[in-house]
C-alpha cells in the first residue's frame, strides 16, 4: 500500500506548505536528505494555544502533535514531490509547552511519532 493510500485510509488530506512566520524556508534539500523547519500546531486554521498541565492535557496535546505531523508530511510532500520516495524519517524533534510539573511530554510527542511510524510506516523515530 502506498503512503497516499494509507493517508486516504486515515482520512488525512495533506495541507499546502504553511507560509513561514519569520525569515526561514519551510525545507531544505541536500543530496538525498530533506530538513524541515519547525511547525506549530493549528486547530481550525489558527494556532493551537494552551499550555500542557495548565489548560490542556495529554490527549489534546497528542491531537495537536498529530496535527503538526500532518503538516510536516504535507511539507515533505512539497519537498520531494512523491512521498513514496521517502525511505525513512531520520529524526523527529518535538518541543512541548508545558508547566514545570507536567511529566507526559513523551506521550504528547507520541501523537506525531505514532502517525509517522505506525500508521504511515516510514519512521524509525
Cite the ranges covered by each PLM segment.
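Short, polar/acidic, helix-capping and beta-turn segments at strand->helix junctions
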Residues: 1-124
Amino acid at each position: 500500500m502506498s503512503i497516499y493510500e494509507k493517508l486516504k485510509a486515515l482520512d488525512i488530506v495533506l495541507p499546502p506548505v504553511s507560509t513561514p512566520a519569520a525569515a526561514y524556508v519551510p525545507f531544505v534539500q541536500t543530496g538525498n536528505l530533506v530538513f524541515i523547519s519547525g511547525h506549530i500546531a493549528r486547530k481550525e486554521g489558527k494556532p493551537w494555544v494552551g499550555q500542557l498541565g495548565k489548560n490542556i492535557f495529554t490527549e489534546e496535546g497528542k491531537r495537536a502533535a498529530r496535527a503538526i505531523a500532518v503538516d510536516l508530511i504535507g511539507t515533505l510532500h512539497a519537498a520531494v514531490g512523491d512521498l513514496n520516495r521517502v525511505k525513512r524519517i531520520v529524526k523527529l524533534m518535538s518541543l512541548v509547552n508545558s508547566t514545570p510539573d507536567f511529566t507526559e511530554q513523551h506521550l504528547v510527542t507520541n501523537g506525531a511519532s505514532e502517525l509517522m511510524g505506525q500508521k504511515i510506516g516510514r519512521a524509525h523515530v
